[in-house]
Swiss-Prot record:
Entry protein name: Glycerol-3-phosphate acyltransferase
Localization per Swiss-Prot or TrEMBL: Cell inner membrane
UniProt xrefs under NCBIfam families: glycerol-3-phosphate 1-O-acyltransferase PlsY
This protein's encoding gene: plsY
Originating organism: Prochlorococcus marinus (strain SARG / CCMP1375 / SS120)
An example molecular function term from Gene Ontology annotations: acyl-phosphate glycerol-3-phosphate acyltransferase activity
Function noted in UniProt: Catalyzes the transfer of an acyl group from acyl-phosphate (acyl-PO(4)) to glycerol-3-phosphate (G3P) to form lysophosphatidic acid (LPA). This enzyme utilizes acyl-phosphate as fatty acyl donor, but not acyl-CoA or acyl-ACP.
UniProt entry tagged with the keyword Cell membrane: yes
Similarity-based family: Belongs to the PlsY family.
Catalytic activity: an acyl phosphate + sn-glycerol 3-phosphate = a 1-acyl-sn-glycero-3-phosphate + phosphate
Pathway the protein acts in: Lipid metabolism; phospholipid metabolism
UniProt keywords, alphabetically: Cell inner membrane, Cell membrane, Lipid biosynthesis, Lipid metabolism, Membrane, Phospholipid biosynthesis, Phospholipid metabolism, Transferase, Transmembrane, Transmembrane helix
Length: 205
């Protein structure tokens, strides 16, 4: 049976969204402590809220799963030999699923770990570069949101540097969109950072 490129593209976008929607953090909270992370702390189902309210080991598993969701979306698109525009569409579908999961009535995470996965899938150099910036900022200030915001802001710069020889407009575009999404999801954190009220690792929200 032959499938048109549009059918394959729609299938890829749907699978990428559903993959991104996998509520790993929510499930960790429910299965381990019987809590709903959407009602605790930052209200996010991401790894940071899991770390603060469930524990280090569950947070590491959630982080790994969320990164894998982003990588998976890009690899699925690449496996179908879809072009760069459709690859970034798959990445954005995965990010959208993570932020607005259908299973949790649209209340999910902040797109940091899944975003890392997307960029590791697109360009491992950019993905590792942003991860390095995240870890550097985190080691100095011990504030996860500041590290996440810094890593997000670095994405367009890293992508531009990495694209000197093979410039890709779609990849540049997704780096800006991902940055905006992460900043928007961290808008309350930004306010607390400005006020000097953002908690460091080891303290609750």
């Amino acid at each position: 049976m032959d499938f048109s490129i549009s059918t394959i593209a729609l299938f890829t976008l749907l699978v990428s969204y559903l993959l991104g929607s996998l509520p790993s953090g929510y499930l960790a909270g429910k299965w381990i402590l019987g809590i709903d992370l959407r009602e605790i702390g930052s209200g996010s189902t991401g790894a940071t809220n899991v770390l603060r309210h469930v524990g280090k080991t569950p947070a590491l598993f959630v982080f790994f799963i969320d990164v894998t969701k982003g990588i998976g979306a890009i690899l699925i698109a690449k496996s179908f030999l879809l072009d760069e525009s459709l690859q970034i569409a798959a990445g954005l579908a995965s990010l959208s699923g993570h932020i607005w999961p259908v299973w949790l009535k649209g209340k999910g995470g902040k797109a940091v770990a899944t975003g890392l996965g997307v960029f590791l899938g697109i360009s491992w150099q950019v993905g590792l570069g942003s991860l390095g910036i995240f870890l550097l900022i985190l080691s100095i200030w011990r504030i996860v949101s500041l590290a996440s915001i810094s890593a997000a802001i670095s994405l367009p710069v890293l992508m531009l540097i990495n694209s000197k020889e093979t410039f890709s407009i779609p990849y540049i575009v997704i780096s800006f969109i991902a940055m905006i999404l992460v900043l928007w999801r961290h808008r309350s954190n930004l306010i607390r950072l400005i006020k000097g009220q953002e908690p460091r690792i080891g303290k609750s929200n």
